[in-house]
Amino acid sequence: MAASMCDVFAFCAEQEPARRTVEIRFVSSGKGKGLFAIRTIRKGETIFQEKPLVSSQFQWNALYRYRACDHCLRSLETAEENAQRLSGNAHVLLPYPELCTVRNGLHQQCPRCQVTYCSAECLKAAAEQYHQILCLETSRDNPAHPLNKLEEAWRNMHYPPETASIMLMARMVGTIKQAQDKDWWLHLFSQFCNKTANEEEEIVHKLLGEKFKGQLDQLRRLFVDALYEERMSRWFTPEGFRSLFALVGTNGQGIGTSSLSQWVHACDALELPPRDREKLDALIDQLYKDIEKVTGEFLNCEGSGLYLLQSCCNHSCVPNAEASFPDNNFILHLTALEDIQPGEEICISYLDCCQRDRSRHSRQKILRENYLFMCSCPKCLAQADEPDITSEEEEEEEEEDDAELEGEPEDAELEDEMTDV
């Protein structure tokens, strides 16, 4: 590729506008680098759009029939098909079907293994980057294939709600093995935040639970069997594999796509007579109520990716920007939540909306356990004198989170969460 060895803008959809808008600066030894505005950025403005270096759908999400493009994670169901499955009602009919952007006629399959892509462009992109190495050919349903054994082992260790994917690491390896310029890709992956050995162990512990040491060694052996490459031999050692695991656990950006959500946003933009608007809004409200009863919180095709420029954004509990996926694929849009002045740091939140509303103590606990830092944003500094206590409701939620980490959920619980999806 033509990009320079240190080009953090290489995967932006429009590189030059991004270069004129933001820059990378060193912040501190604790924070490392950060993303800063070069010019005034207005509230609601898209700061940049970026493709990931690699991405992958979560294993359980794919297993439970959340059909997504194997490359860009675009939802392959039409909005109506999506609504029918999520609500458990095959008779759901959506008005304004022309607002759905999914085109089944464009879908393509790998001729060797039959995985599905949303378009010929995605099939080609995957084949050129990593799929020639990772294609299962006729062994897609063969449990003895090394890659299938690796995926099965991962599913038995990391249950919903999912936060990482072993196949993201596999695609990193596949990308380098298949690349002509292997050093370029190795350098790109080296740009992501690295941790000390003790910090890496904490991240692995968080992802795999109490038995993480034995599980990590099992995963590493399967990873070696499936993907070993001499050029990246360090990644396959116990220390290197732990580092690779921690890199994905710390830097992986969650991706969510939904053809139904995209259709709803398109409906919101329609100019309708008041009575028609009221009728449409009532239909959508009832649909989401029905979906919540059947599906709960699992609405999207979900996965994670590594984004070179976006990974430079530090956290704040009062972010001035947010990442989203409005195109129903893996293209990340970073959007300003408020006016941002030249020289001001651009921060996102690593916490969801509910977590940001928790007490300072609870927020710090989540950030410390998942990202290994203590937040010093304006909100946390303003609340520094608050006692280190949590509400009863927050304690219950934390106990549930901790219980998920301690071991495997019961099969019945999984069925309750994801049945009929």
Curated annotation (Swiss-Prot):
EC number(s) recorded for this UniProt protein: 2.1.1.-, 2.1.1.372, 2.1.1.359
Protein name per the record: Protein-lysine N-trimethyltransferase SMYD5
Residues holding S-adenosyl-L-methionine: Y350
Zn-finger (MYND-type) residues: 97-135
UniProt-listed InterPro entries: SET_dom, SET_dom_sf, SMYD5_SET
Protein species of origin: Xenopus laevis
Subcellular localization: Cytoplasm
Protease among keywords: no
GO term, biological process aspect, one: methylation
Cysteine pairings via disulfide bonds: none
Source organism, top-level taxon: Eukaryota
Keyword annotations: Cytoplasm, Metal-binding, Methyltransferase, S-adenosyl-L-methionine, Transferase, Zinc, Zinc-finger
Catalysed reaction equations from the record: L-lysyl-[protein] + 3 S-adenosyl-L-methionine = N(6),N(6),N(6)-trimethyl-L-lysyl-[protein] + 3 S-adenosyl-L-homocysteine + 3 H(+); L-lysyl(20)-[histone H4] + 3 S-adenosyl-L-methionine = N(6),N(6),N(6)-trimethyl-L-lysyl(20)-[histone H4] + 3 S-adenosyl-L-homocysteine + 3 H(+); L-lysyl(36)-[histone H3] + 3 S-adenosyl-L-methionine = N(6),N(6),N(6)-trimethyl-L-lysyl(36)-[histone H3] + 3 S-adenosyl-L-homocysteine + 3 H(+)
Record keyword Secreted present: no
